[in-house]
Amino acid sequence: MSNVGQQLLSGGLSGLATTVCLQPFDLLKTRLQQGDGSTWRPTRPHTSIILDITRDVIHSGGWRGLWRGTTPSLVRNVPGVALYMTSLTQLRALMATSPYFASLRRRPQNGDANKNTSSVLPKLTSQGNLIAGATTRVGVGFLLNPFSVLKARFESNIYAYESLTGAFGTIVRQGPSELLRGFLASSLRDAPYAGLFVVFYEGIKHEASYVLPPVTSTQATLIHGLSAASAGAIATMATHPFDVIKTKIQVRTEAQYHGFLTTIATIWKQRGITGYFDGASLRMSRKVLSSAIGWAVYEGGLMLMRTST
């Protein structure tokens, strides 16, 4: 199998694993963010609100209700993650041929011969990783935005969609602008998120490989998982307000949620600064876990396939 084929397969497996395992986090986050907070007491803890939403979901749809929207999530995430990780790896490999972005960072020490076993990915400077992550994420996000809209609306309880094809047909009939709804907010969230994630992931992984030399595949997988979880936590908190804005635009139908700036103003008027962090704990939990699972599966899969060929 070619390198690109290996990357697509590993990326697809990564997307499948994270989506199936963590869909309840996504659904609860969407339900929490879709509201305007008018039914919540200002001092009410988020944990209590999340528990109420969870009970409502289980009451109306049983435990399976927590996995509502899994199909559109898979439709978006499996090819999306495969395309993103493959494109990111290919772009980084291309950028690594440039003296402006190729990483020269190296810390020689005893056992240095094993240092490359922690990763099979191209090495770039921090600036290169930032640009590669942001550029790739926005490009893939543009292609898959229609599925993001579909996923958000399927997870929401505002729309009574009975089938995936029926939901997609309704969105298509509403016009091209509906297919790209929320793309600006998504880009403002995803570009810095992906850029920061790759920078911190590679940086933490580089340093961790000297604390725990990845002599075995198990140690390498542990480094990948912990590095990705840490990077995911940092990048998530830095970009969460744009996630709230994106969800409002894609799910709410009122006029005040049709534009990026008007949505920002509406959230501020109704909730203040706290409104921009609705669902932050859920997104943080999901991103930390999905980053750890996703990148451990991706890099581990690549290392396994390359050592077996």
Swiss-Prot record:
Catalytic activity: glycine(in) = glycine(out)
Residues passing through the membrane, by range: 8-33, 69-95, 130-155, 182-205, 223-249, 279-297
Keywords on record: Membrane, Mitochondrion, Mitochondrion inner membrane, Repeat, Transmembrane, Transmembrane helix, Transport
Keyword presence, Lipid metabolism: no
GO BP: any one term: glycine import into mitochondrion
GO-annotated cellular components: mitochondrial inner membrane
Disulphide-bridged cysteine pairs: none
InterPro entries: Hem25/SLC25A38, Mit_carrier, Mitochondrial_sb/sol_carrier, Mt_carrier_dom_sf
Spans of repeat Solcar: 2-94, 124-207, 219-304
Membrane topology listed for this record: Multi-pass membrane protein
Gene Ontology molecular-function annotations: glycine transmembrane transporter activity
Location relative to the cell: Mitochondrion inner membrane
PROSITE patterns, sorted: SOLCAR
Gene3D superfamilies from the UniProt entry: Mitochondrial carrier domain
Main localization of the protein described in the UniProt heading: mitochondrion
Matches recorded under Pfam families: Mito_carr
Role played: Mitochondrial glycine transporter that imports glycine into the mitochondrial matrix. Plays an important role in providing glycine for the first enzymatic step in heme biosynthesis, the condensation of glycine with succinyl-CoA to produce 5-aminolevulinate (ALA) in the mitochondrial matrix.
Family: Belongs to the mitochondrial carrier (TC 2.A.29) family. SLC25A38 subfamily.
PANTHER family: MITOCHONDRIAL GLYCINE TRANSPORTER
UniProt protein name: Mitochondrial glycine transporter
Protein's organism: Laccaria bicolor (strain S238N-H82 / ATCC MYA-4686) (Bicoloured deceiver)
Lineage, top ranks: Eukaryota, Fungi, Dikarya, Basidiomycota, Agaricomycotina
